[in-house]
Amino acid sequence: MQKTNKFLKIGNKEFKSRLLVGTGKYSSLEVMQKSLINTKCEIVTVAVRRVQGLEHGHKGLMESIDWKRIWMLPNTAGCSNAEEAIRIARLGRELAKLAGQETNNFVKLEVIPDKKYLLPDPIGTLKAAEQLVKEGFTVLPYINSDPLIAKQLEEIGCATVMPLGSPIGSAQGIRNAANIAMIIAESRIPIIIDAGIGVPSEAAQALEMGADGVLINSAIALAENPILMAQAFSKATEAGRDGYLSGRLKENPLASPSSPLDGVISNN
């Protein structure tokens, strides 16, 4: 993507904030509400299956968020194959309409058959993405940090790709920076790092690398003080983006004095 300070553009929508936030795992809806405010986010993910099933922590979720201010990103969490993900994506679009977002065709596509490490299925993701793009969805697929899959998803019309930093909820940070750097370098669509980020400095690292945004859930929701951590991630995301735009000092194997040596008083 071009090195610019314009808004984050996904599909035909523009957003000031580059921090996307999940809505799961909070101790209460009140903590979630206050945390979302502190993140200054404009996009939140909602697990369609969990909201519909009124699972613990999701009852009352739809009524707890100001959908006039925040854009809903329905996700297909819990889907293990392409067919299931396509069906849930369609339900997600209806959920967004119920929230008053009639033109919202966004979907965070997750196809995860692996229950231990929660790694996405590249073949199922590609299959589901292709169909959803045909149906007019703005598709944001969650993927492994595989440059080839990222490029294929871009070519079929996905609005962004969301490579994982490390497994979901693991707080291991960005373990595959080289692959993610390749994806960023070769992409013409926004890259949003999703999963594995545990602390604000890792969010800053992602933005400094040139990623267009980050999606955070567990690192905020499960922090000792989620509301304060939300604020920290907001600041880190802004700092990381500014650092990227500023152009970092290049690494050098040799030292370089901060003060010039010309004119230094000698002992002679």
UniProtKB/Swiss-Prot annotation:
Any matching Pfam family: ThiG
Record Gene3D superfamilies: Aldolase class I (3.20.20.70)
GO molecular function, one term: thiazole synthase activity
Keywords in alphabetical order: Cytoplasm, Schiff base, Thiamine biosynthesis, Transferase
Catalytic reaction list: [ThiS sulfur-carrier protein]-C-terminal-Gly-aminoethanethioate + 2-iminoacetate + 1-deoxy-D-xylulose 5-phosphate = [ThiS sulfur-carrier protein]-C-terminal Gly-Gly + 2-[(2R,5Z)-2-carboxy-4-methylthiazol-5(2H)-ylidene]ethyl phosphate + 2 H2O + H(+)
GO cellular component, one term: cytoplasm
Classification via InterPro entries: Aldolase_TIM, Thiazole_synthase_ThiG, ThiG
Binding locations of 1-deoxy-D-xylulose 5-phosphate: 169, 195-196, 217-218
A GO biological process held by the record: thiamine diphosphate biosynthetic process
Pathway this chain belongs to: Cofactor biosynthesis; thiamine diphosphate biosynthesis
Stretches with biased composition (Polar residues): 255-268
Main location: cytoplasm
Catalytic-site annotation from UniProt: 108
Quaternary structure and partners: Homotetramer. Forms heterodimers with either ThiH or ThiS.
UniProt function note: Catalyzes the rearrangement of 1-deoxy-D-xylulose 5-phosphate (DXP) to produce the thiazole phosphate moiety of thiamine. Sulfur is provided by the thiocarboxylate moiety of the carrier protein ThiS. In vitro, sulfur can be provided by H(2)S.
Annotated HAMAP family: ThiG (MF_00443)
PANTHER family xrefs: THIAZOLE SYNTHASE
Name under which the protein is recorded: Thiazole synthase
Protein's organism: Prochlorococcus marinus (strain NATL2A)
